[in-house]
UniProtKB/Swiss-Prot annotation:
Its EC number is 6.3.2.6. Keywords: ATP-binding, Ligase, Nucleotide-binding, Purine biosynthesis. GO terms for molecular function: ATP binding; phosphoribosylaminoimidazolesuccinocarboxamide synthase activity. Pathway: Purine metabolism; IMP biosynthesis via de novo pathway; 5-amino-1-(5-phospho-D-ribosyl)imidazole-4-carboxamide from 5-amino-1-(5-phospho-D-ribosyl)imidazole-4-carboxylate: step 1/2. Signal peptide: none annotated. This is Putative phosphoribosylaminoimidazole-succinocarboxamide synthase B. PANTHER family: PHOSPHORIBOSYLAMINOIMIDAZOLE-SUCCINOCARBOXAMIDE SYNTHASE. Belongs to the SAICAR synthetase family. The gene is purC2. It is an enzyme of class 6 (ligase). It catalyses: 5-amino-1-(5-phospho-D-ribosyl)imidazole-4-carboxylate + L-aspartate + ATP = (2S)-2-[5-amino-1-(5-phospho-beta-D-ribosyl)imidazole-4-carboxamido]succinate + ADP + phosphate + 2 H(+). Gene3D superfamilies: ATP-grasp fold, B domain (3.30.470.20), Phosphorylase Kinase, domain 1 (3.30.200.20). GO terms for biological process: 'de novo' IMP biosynthetic process. The keyword Transport does not apply.
Length: 304
């Protein structure tokens, strides 16, 4: 399977995100094509990560299947043959879309990242260690790095296609989407995370934190969209290696984050685009983490 930095399919391309290319199928459907692009600290790298697009698409498809009947979602199919049957123009491009395409329902997307944190890690730990707060809200004193947060903390952010997302308060979120919608988004976020965290733990994975996106479909329903509990949207830890009070090894893009942190501390990168080039060792280590995440979450090896 070749890597993909960008795509060119015989459908109108209506969007390009940090990782996904979005194509219009018709008035009701979209094709989401997950490339092997990778971003960290909201900056897209110049290199691709082998198998990454397929991992993200197929983990999301797994979770959408598990969530069937729990929350409504946008996925129609992530099976390549089913997609080609529904969109025959894609038949000559089977090799390009294999494993990485998802046929989805169109929605009007809410401009909010619904972040939920079950453990104190990453940027949340850095904020707490500095000011004793998370998303601007005071937390109890004495928490340690990677400590479990009970209950999990909902901390929304604005959604940026490029550049840096910005954490916002729940009060600000209510101003953006309205009180009723804000309540629904938080409730759905908590329900999805609770179910996902329980199922992942059975597979030996802790989902330390994750983020979701939602949209409103043509019938007015709020539905789950985009990706679900993947290595790009989540922090995965091994249950059997979890030790609060220290950083945890992650089954996600942590090798990339660690490398970029070194480059920033050394003054070789200022945190904005363009990013530094990635060594082959970082690319390989990151690809292995993605494939391991798929195996851990689904209990299967990825076969495309």
């Amino acid at each position: 399977m070749t890597t993909m930095l960008s795509s060119d399919l015989p459908l109108p391309k209506i969007g390009r995100g940090k990782v996904r290319d979005i194509y219009a199928v018709d008035d009701d459907r979209l094709l989401l094509l997950t490339t092997d692009r990778i971003s960290a600290f909201d900056v897209v790298m110049g290199e691709t990560i082998p198998m990454k697009g397929a991992v993200l698409t197929q983990i999301s498809a797994f979770w959408f299947g598990e969530l069937e009947g729990v929350v409504p979602h946008h996925m129609i199919s992530a099976d390549t043959d089913e997609i080609i049957a529904a969109v025959p123009a894609l038949k000559p491009h089977r090799a390009e879309i294999l494993g990485r395409a998802m046929l989805s329902r169109r929605t009007t997307v809410f401009p909010i990242e619904c972040v939920i944190r079950g453990y104190l890690s990453g940027s949340a730990w850095k904020e707490y260690a500095t000011s004793g707060t998370l998303a601007g809200e005071k937390l109890k004193a004495g928490l340690v790095e990677s400590e479990k947060l009970e209950p999990a903390i909902f901390s929304p952010a604005t959604k940026a296609e490029t550049g840096h997302d910005e954490n916002i308060t729940i009060a600000r979120m209510r101003e953006v989407v309205g009180d009723e919608t804000a309540y629904t988004l938080e409730s759905m976020t908590r329900a999805i995370y609770t179910l996902g965290e329980e199922l992942a733990r059975e597979q030996g994975i802790i989902i330390a934190d994750t983020k979701f996106e939602f949209g409103r479909d043509k019938d007015g329903r709020i539905i789950l969209i985009d990706e679900v509990m993947t290595p790009d949207s989540s922090r995965f830890w091994a249950v059997d290696a979890y030790k609060p009070g220290q950083p945890q090894a992650s089954f996600d893009k942590q090798p990339l984050r660690d490398y970029l942190d070194v480059e920033r501390r050394a003054g070789r990168w200022n945190g904005d685009a363009p990013p530094p080039p990635l060594p082959a060792s970082v690319v390989e280590a990151t690809s292995k983490r993605y494939l391991e995440a798929y195996r851990r979450v689904t209990g299967k090896e990825l076969k495309i």
